């Protein structure tokens, strides 16, 4: 398995399985002198961890992160940062009945075909449990971006099943278990999830992430465009089946006069492009959305085959998220942070001396609301 490292200058390598002893990460390329503590990382880990509400998996993991190296007297040293989170609430017996079966729409079948062996306990390495280390590493990246460039990254749930939520109030996002920015939609989401739990079914979701106070010039055309790398990062999250930058697929129905982001000396008049032109950041908010499929670990029987190719009926009795998108917001934020920091360091290395002489256009016209 060779796909466990992300980034070029700011790199993150993760290891560990869902029911193994621990999860870990090695971060390399972190600038020195940044104040960093375990508490800084724990804030985002607590936002992601399981068992925090009745609408997520009831697996109880403290997700207490330990910084093993790379930090001295409260500051990064520039050497590799080692991170570790112990698994404490594995219940592998839940998976005994399906160890020789392939759960529909899971990685069971493909892992077995590729490697000839798989850890069936909770999905092993393919489990979303692995994303705890992405969130921890992303918290480091967030801290560096805020300190060196003033960039802030945050996200929200923009759709749960058929229920759409507009970005009305950032302050509401952390006040409910859904990361929903529209307070009026929360009761509807609660009722929907309660009905879903009774049914034993699951549903998908859409998450939107935004990087504010962006700087222009990040992105390496032609193959390492910042939007291409961002799409790569977000598609690498478990259960993600689609990514949009800015207007995304809605641009198909737009006319050129609607989609073009006109520029004035006072600022950009809109942000249909999502803060990227030609694969390079414009300095506007960098905006991406991702679609997450419904989990197929269900109490409702489903058809599949066993390792010998015989037909079987699969029922999954483990502890699973009825909507994996509910806990995906901090994961998406983390992946966006990793991409932006990697590109910021690459840009500083090659183009840090460049002075274009072109005035920096504000991200939007002062007082303008909307896209």
Curated annotation (Swiss-Prot):
One of its GO terms (biological process) is chorismate biosynthetic process. Reduced FMN (FMNH(2)). One of its GO terms (molecular function) is chorismate synthase activity. It is an enzyme of class 4 (lyase). It holds the Pfam family Chorismate_synt. CDD domains: Chorismate_synthase. Homotetramer. This is Chorismate synthase.
């Amino acid at each position: 398995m060779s796909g466990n490292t992300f980034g070029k200058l700011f790199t993150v390598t993760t290891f560990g399985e869902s029911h193994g002893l621990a999860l870990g990460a090695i971060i390399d390329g972190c600038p020195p002198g940044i104040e960093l503590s375990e508490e800084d990382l724990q804030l985002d880990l607590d936002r992601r961890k399981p068992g925090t509400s009745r609408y997520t998996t009831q697996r109880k993991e403290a997700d207490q992160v330990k910084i093993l190296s790379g930090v001295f007297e409260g500051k990064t040293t520039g050497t590799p940062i080692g991170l570790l989170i112990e698994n404490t609430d594995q219940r592998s017996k839940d998976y005994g009945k399906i160890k020789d079966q392939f759960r529909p729409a899971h990685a069971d079948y493909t892992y077995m075909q590729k490697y000839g062996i798989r850890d069936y306990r909770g999905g092993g390495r393919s489990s979303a449990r692995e994303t705890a280390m992405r969130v921890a590493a992303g918290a480091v990246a967030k801290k560096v971006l805020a300190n060196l460039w003033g960039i802030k990254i945050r996200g929200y749930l923009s759709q749960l099943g058929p229920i759409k939520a507009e970005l009305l109030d950032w302050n509401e996002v952390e006040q409910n278990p859904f990361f929903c920015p529209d307070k009026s939609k929360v009761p509807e989401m609660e009722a929907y999830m309660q009905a879903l739990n009774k049914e034993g079914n699951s549903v998908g979701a859409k998450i939107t992430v935004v990087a504010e106070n962006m700087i222009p010039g990040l992105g390496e055309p032609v193959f390492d465009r910042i939007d291409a790398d961002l799409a790569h990062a977000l598609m690498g999250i478990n259960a993600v089946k689609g990514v949009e930058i800015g207007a995304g697929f809605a641009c198909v129905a737009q006319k050129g006069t609607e989609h073009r982001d006109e520029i004035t000396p006072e600022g950009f008049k809109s942000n249909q492009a999502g803060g990227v032109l030609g694969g390079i950041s414009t300095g506007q908010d960098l905006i991406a959305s991702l679609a997450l499929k419904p989990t197929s670990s269900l109490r409702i029987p489903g058809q599949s085959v066993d390792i010998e190719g015989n037909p079987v009926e699969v029922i999954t009795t483990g502890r699973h998220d009825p909507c994996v998108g509910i806990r995906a917001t901090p994961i998406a934020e983390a992946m966006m942070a990793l991409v932006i920091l990697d590109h910021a360091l690459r840009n500083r290395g090659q183009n840090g001396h460049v002075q274009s002489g072109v005035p920096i256009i504000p991200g939007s016209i002062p007082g303008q609301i909307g896209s």
